[in-house]
Design a protein with these regions (language model features):
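N-terminal edge beta-strand
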Residues: 21-46
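Short, solvent-exposed loop/turn elements at domain surfaces
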Residues: 31-34, 56-60, 74-76
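Beta-strand signatures of extracellular beta-sandwich domains
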Residues: 64-68
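Short amphipathic, basic-aromatic surface patches that mediate peripheral association
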Residues: 51-55
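Extracellular/periplasmic metallocenter environments
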Residues: 102-145
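Positively charged n-region of N-terminal signal peptides that target proteins for export
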Residues: 1-4
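Aromatic- and Gly/Pro-rich amphipathic surface segment
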Residues: 70-104
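Sec/Tat signal peptide C-region and signal peptidase I cleavage site
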Residues: 15-19
């Protein structure tokens, strides 16, 4: 009977052990994310829904969300992004690609994108918009516990 109770308890706990964190983030024409801090648990799948709630087109006021590995120098990474227009302002060199945990598409006003990723290690994961000049204002931190 004890074994059956343990199995039943494990089955009840299983769905919460692997719960999916859902995050809704927006960016606007004033170069602002609606959240500067986000939280998740290590090993937990994150579904990020990102919407550009402004009206300006992608060529004038494009926004994305790029999550970087803990310890990444945001200014150095953003400097490489500025010259990567043909790739949605995401650098293509191996060193930079290794710093990226997850990234949405570059969006214009009214557009949205959804990504899924799973941070496996605890830490402070910076996130930024890589459109030229935006990272100085459009950045935050995903704290993974």
């Amino acid at each position: 009977m004890k074994k059956l109770s343990l199995i039943f308890a494990a089955l009840i706990a299983a769905p919460t052990a692997f719960a999916d964190t859902k995050i809704e983030l927006t960016g606007n024409d004033q170069m602002q994310f609606n959240a500067k801090t986000l939280e998740a648990k290590a090993g937990e799948s994150i579904t990020l829904s990102f919407k550009h709630i402004g009206t300006l087109p992608v060529v004038a006021m494009g926004h994305n969300v790029v999550f970087l590995k803990p310890g990444t120098s945001v200014p150095a990474f953003a400097a490489k992004c500025a010259s990567a227009k043909d790739n949605g302002y995401l650098p293509t060199d191996d060193e930079s690609k290794a710093m990226i945990v997850a990234a949405t598409k570059l969006l214009g006003g009214g557009q949205s994108d959804e990504i899924k990723f799973t941070p496996t290690e605890p830490g402070a994961y910076p996130y930024i918009c890589t459109f030229p000049g935006h990272f100085a204002i459009m950045q935050g931190v995903l704290t993974v516990k």
